[in-house]
Regions:
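ABC transporter nucleotide-binding domains
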Residues: 5, 12-185, 190-204, 210
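A short linear hydrophobic-aromatic micro-motif
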Residues: 105, 243-247, 278-282
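C-terminal coupling/interaction segments
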Residues: 260-299
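Residue-level "edge-of-site" marker
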Residues: 128, 251, 285
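ABC transporter nucleotide-binding domain
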Residues: 170-255, 259
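ABC-family P-loop ATPase nucleotide-binding domain
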Residues: 1-11, 299
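Hydrophobic side chains in well-ordered alpha-helices
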Residues: 73, 110, 213, 233-237, ...
Length: 299
């Protein structure tokens, strides 16, 4: 899979504050790539650097294989780091005409196509002040789509929206991916990244915690909890089961972690019995995705 953005060892400080600390990852073409982390984790700073709004103290980034991205390559990138200043009394069409004239991106002929992409074509002549919060944000994304960029960079695209607006924007992001755009978006919402992103990088206090396919990063797991009269003997015979075996001293139990859907309870019970250990407890628990996220960010 081709890479549209490669970030290599990027660091940024503000005085004594280290906003980013040697962050590196690649964004695959055609993905919806989420940069996930709590407030203050460095998400917006990182987007500012790759969009040339901020300068890194260290490291580099490549757009389409070129350091920093040439002016020609930059035309392939649409960006929404903050909401544009639209005129409340003008229509969606007229607001985009002004944006197009100022930015020089695309042509006036592109505006109708952009409005169709963001599902505002039927309201194109309505005044901006009559739009819902979700519609206003869709128009802002439409402004970033002028010139038909290959990549769209969004900073917290659903921030401040009501539930209806959030659903509208998430649906739009998925639709834009299906139309061939690569989406890079910052978010502090685990639920958002789970629902719309194919890949993600998790940041905490400027450090990259993990990156990769969302399904792998946030993989749900089977946790089998066992106990026996002789807990030491149980721990000893279970070392060959699952990918990880832990002793929980507080509960006086042994936990085996399996990939989701692979724990076979009957086999575990039979194995223990065949090895001279009679179980007093055998319980299958599911690790919640939220727990996995907090586990990653708290380690």
């Amino acid at each position: 899979m081709s890479v549209v953005l490669s970030i290599k060892n990027v660091a940024k400080t503000y005085g004594a504050v280290r906003a980013l600390n040697g962050v590196s990852f690649d964004v695959p073409q055609g993905s919806v790539f989420g940069i996930l982390g709590p407030n203050g984790s460095g998400k917006t700073t990182l987007l500012g650097i790759v969009m040339d709004v901020l300068k890194a103290n260290k490291g580099e980034f490549l757009w389409f294989g070129q350091p920093g991205g040439s002016p020609e390559q930059r035309k392939k990138i649409g960006c929404l780091l903050e909401t544009p200043n639209f005129y409340s009394y003008l229509s969606g069409t007229d607001n985009l005409k002004i944006t197009q004239a100022i930015s020089g991106r695309g042509t006036k002929a592109d505006i109708d196509e952009v409005l169709k992409k963001v599902n505002l074509y039927d309201r194109r002549w309505s005044s901006f002040k009559s739009f819902s919060l979700g519609m206003k944000q869709r128009l802002a994304i439409g402004a970033a789509l002028l010139g038909n960029p290959k990549v769209l960079v969004l900073d917290e695209p659903t921030n401040g929206l009501d539930p209806v607006g959030i659903a509208e924007i998430r649906k739009l992001i998925v639709e834009l991916k299906e139309q061939g755009h690569t989406i890079i978006m910052a978010s502090h919402l685990l639920d958002e990244v789970e629902k719309v992103c194919t890949h993600a990088a998790i940041l905490k206090t400027g450090n990259l915690i993990t990156t990769g396919d969302v399904a792998e990063i946030m993989m749900d797991e089977d946790i089998v909890e066992l106990s026996a009269a002789d807990i030491n003997a149980l721990s000893s015979i279970l070392q060959h089961f699952g990918k990880e075996v832990f002793f929980d001293e507080k509960k006086n139990t042994v936990q085996i972690i399996f990939p989701k859907g692979t724990a076979k309870m009957e086999e575990i019970n039979q194995y223990c019995f065949n090895n001279g250990v009679v179980l007093t407890q055998l319980v299958l628990r599911k690790k919640r995705l939220e727990a996995r996220f907090f586990e990653l960010t708290n380690n």
